[in-house]
């Protein structure tokens, strides 16, 4: 594979995470405007975003098989057509049913693209380089989470309709579409070259279950928290711009944290530092919820930084529970994390309707505490120390 081809594929991976990050994170910023557009209460409007998350979950789950049937390049190009149709549906329809359908399609497209992006990184890079590349790729999710809420606040403050935010997100996919030209993708399925050594099946162990629960609770807690921060902040009397700045601050420090931890993690035992980070994240989230307005930006900045490496560390630890990294095991943990994404508004919507945004934030805090317990319990059963090689550190 040529170096320019590898660079193109790596950028497709980066942008695939940015696309999903933009779609998932911008929800909290535009939810109120979309609720006004359809003349619905915010809590019931949030349920329609479950279609976006369901699309992401279904596509990540199915793409494990779909990648072996439909070439990756074809999937990405077809995804661009679907993206254009979905954004057009948002722009030209006043039907809630069509809005939900468009959200589902956006979820499908971003889920397929993100699973292709993850696969490309694991194919292109080995050992320690793979781990740092995955962290760097994941940082594009956060980068989009920093940029697009600012774009949304800029557009909404100028009374520009909310659907133009999704048109801007569509530009990320346009870049992916352009990159597919003159680019060779790895072959899969029948066309792939199989290694001569047979793969020995290994038992996963209970540690994988702890990690799967941690992945689900972490993503559900994180998105449940960040999706309702704008509404919570507005309820405290903050302006839309200030509320948007809190979300952007979180993802900015999350992004810097990922870059920092891609160097820091190699000097520590992964399970131990993961437990410390999960505990700190739970404490910092509690301080944000109970703190004063003046301290909120500082707490959310430190929360973003210290929680940035948690999810990627969970996935990395999962891959180290077997001697030979199992794609199905990693996919299982990823799927559990994506279930957390799908459940975000299913869980938090009724809580907000009944008790307000602060109750949703406290629920998210409780989920972070569960992540800490799971990571602590993992220390007694994890196999990563016996399976990790010098190349992994």
Swiss-Prot record:
Domain of life: Bacteria
GO cellular component: plasma membrane
Residue ranges of the TM segments: 11-31, 51-71, 78-98, 101-121, 134-154, 162-182, 206-226, 245-265, 273-293, 298-318, 332-352, 361-381
Keyword flag DNA repair: no
Main location: membrane
GO molecular function: transmembrane transporter activity
Membrane topology qualifier: Multi-pass membrane protein
Topological domains, Periplasmic: 32-50, 99-100, 155-161, 227-244, 294-297, 353-360
Cytoplasmic topological domain: 1-10, 72-77, 122-133, 183-205, 266-272, 319-331, 382-393
Subcellular location: Cell inner membrane
Keyword Cell membrane: yes
UniProt-listed InterPro entries: MFS, MFS_dom, MFS_trans_sf, MFS_TsgA, MFS_TsgA-like
Record's keyword terms, sorted: Cell inner membrane, Cell membrane, Membrane, Transmembrane, Transmembrane helix
Record NCBIfam families: PRK03699.1
Family of the protein in this entry: Belongs to the major facilitator superfamily. TsgA family.
Protein's recorded name: Protein TsgA
Protein's organism: Salmonella typhi
Lineage: Bacteria, Pseudomonadati, Pseudomonadota, Gammaproteobacteria, Enterobacterales
Gene from which this protein is expressed: tsgA
